[in-house]
Amino acid sequence: MVKIKEGFKGERLVSLPEELLASYRREPLINNLYVRKIGFFPRVKYHFLQKEHGCDYAMLIYCTEGKGWYRILGKQYTVEKYQYIIIPPGIPYSFGADEGDPWTIYWLHFQGKLRDQFLPSHPVPVTISPNEYSRLQDRLRLFEEIYSSFSMGYIKEYMIYSSMCLYNFLASFIYLEQFRHIMIPSQKEYPFTARVIHYMREN
């Protein structure tokens, strides 16, 4: 079976030199939470990654099309459209794309003093069900904002901004109800046509 870590058609990814990241760890607006690497992989057939000893960073994977799988702590899970996983540091794991319906994923590595505050109690896939308040596109716009800023991370102010945005991005998964609450109208009546239009935009 073919196994590929990265180098896919249409992929986008950004990383910064470890020496630069080490210097940023002294910055109070960065060292609590920051991106180490970030990317987007579209329909990545044969995608596979295994870490036999885990990593010193956490990783978020958000699947928006297709499906894949994820193995950790002796259990294997299917990861489908509108599901995400947060992989904790220090634990061996592996994951990969489904052969017949390979996933499209947005992913990032994150680190910092507050990293563990964003880890789940159980590292299993979580579903984000689309509805009229789902804000799926808002979340992807946040990702793109982080990606764009981090890609300019050689300039300290852009790195700081990417770290500030990272709080909001991670919170959009972990505090899903609160993230969606802003879309719930204060009026008692929410027009049916508005709900239909929003759903079509999200899907």
For the regions a language model picked out, list residue spans one by one:
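N-terminal regulatory/effector-sensing and dimerization cores
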Residues: 30-125
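Generic signal for short, ordered secondary-structure residues
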Residues: 10, 17-18, 39, 125, ...
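Amphipathic alpha-helical segments enriched in hydrophobic/aromatic residues interleaved with Lys/Arg
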Residues: 117-187, 194-198
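N-proximal short alpha-helices
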Residues: 4-7, 11, 33-36, 135, ...
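A short, N-terminal "cap"/entry segment at the start of jelly-roll beta-barrel domains
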Residues: 1-34, 51, 153, 176
